[in-house]
Amino acid sequence: MGRQKELMNRCGEMLHIRYRLLRQALAECLGTLILVMFGCGSVAQVVLSRGTHGGFLTINLAFGFAVTLAILVAGQVSGAHLNPAVTFAMCFLAREPWIKLPIYTLAQTLGAFLGAGIVFGLYYDAIWAFAGNELVVSGPNGTAGIFATYPSGHLDMVNGFFDQFIGTAALIVCVLAIVDPYNNPVPRGLEAFTVGLVVLVIGTSMGFNSGYAVNPARDFGPRLFTALAGWGSEVFTTGQNWWWVPIVSPLLGSIGGVFVYQLMIGCHLEQPPPSTEAENVKLAHMKHKEQI
């Protein structure tokens, strides 16, 4: 037992990454992988069973709890943004350095890509059998929607853009309230569960139009995977070239959420003098102003 523990400690020392930003990027990658693996896995179960093994509520529950678990896994290392829109908002508020935006975004997109790959491997036989050994993007036998979001038939581009903007703005407003130490603070340790509840509420109230991506990495990573895995370029052209909406609109929505929260809440809170220069407003009790 003692020798095994010593060996494990040595391996841990050898594998330890000293560059903090790289450690944080790895945590974002794993956290987003967990989010997509559980979230898209629930969609796969519903779609491939044609509704006999779940439904709209189970999908939203899975995504909500997936966010909670991802924050618990990655939060202490990176803050568990899991979403370029969240990272963008934090950088815009000067709570994170701008260098983190491209690095976190790349890590989150890679994690989403890998999470989609795991779901594809897990349901490989079922996906191929679903449409008679074909990979169909849309329609009654479509399976690309397991991985990325697509607009409903009634939805036009303008309404879809607004849908993603409002969903992301709502997410950011709630996240900022949760991590704001001067507002009603969430009890220590419950931040992850509260953010998961926010995602669940957004899904059950705003998921009908286009599946509430509200996360560029969660949508683009799996979409890119499906393009490479056999669904082809149609995943980008379907829905009047819908693919760019879940990327651009959430980023704009994140800024909208920042302005709404700051103008209506954040700027008016009584703020006692901070004990340190750092702001303790991360989802997992980490300091925002860190040395990279």
UniProtKB/Swiss-Prot annotation:
Reactions catalysed according to its record: glycerol(in) = glycerol(out); H2O(in) = H2O(out); urea(in) = urea(out); H2O2(out) = H2O2(in)
Regulation: Channel activity is inhibited by mercury ions.
Domain of life: Eukaryota
Intramembrane segments of this protein: 79-92, 211-224
Keywords: Cell membrane, Glycoprotein, Membrane, Repeat, Transmembrane, Transmembrane helix, Transport
InterPro entries documented for this protein: Aquaporin-like, Aquaporin_3, MIP, MIP/Aquaporin, MIP_CS
A Gene Ontology biological process term: glycerol transmembrane transport
Annotated tissue distribution: Detected in kidney medulla and papilla, in collecting duct cells. Detected in colon.
SUPFAM superfamilies registered for this protein in UniProt: Aquaporin-like
Annotated transmembrane regions: 25-42, 57-74, 101-121, 160-177, 190-206, 243-264
Compartments in which it is found: Cell membrane; Basolateral cell membrane
Assembly and oligomerization: Homotetramer; each monomer provides an independent glycerol/water pore. Could also exist in other oligomeric states.
Listed name of the protein: Aquaporin-3
Originating organism: Rattus norvegicus (Rat)
Gene name of this polypeptide: Aqp3
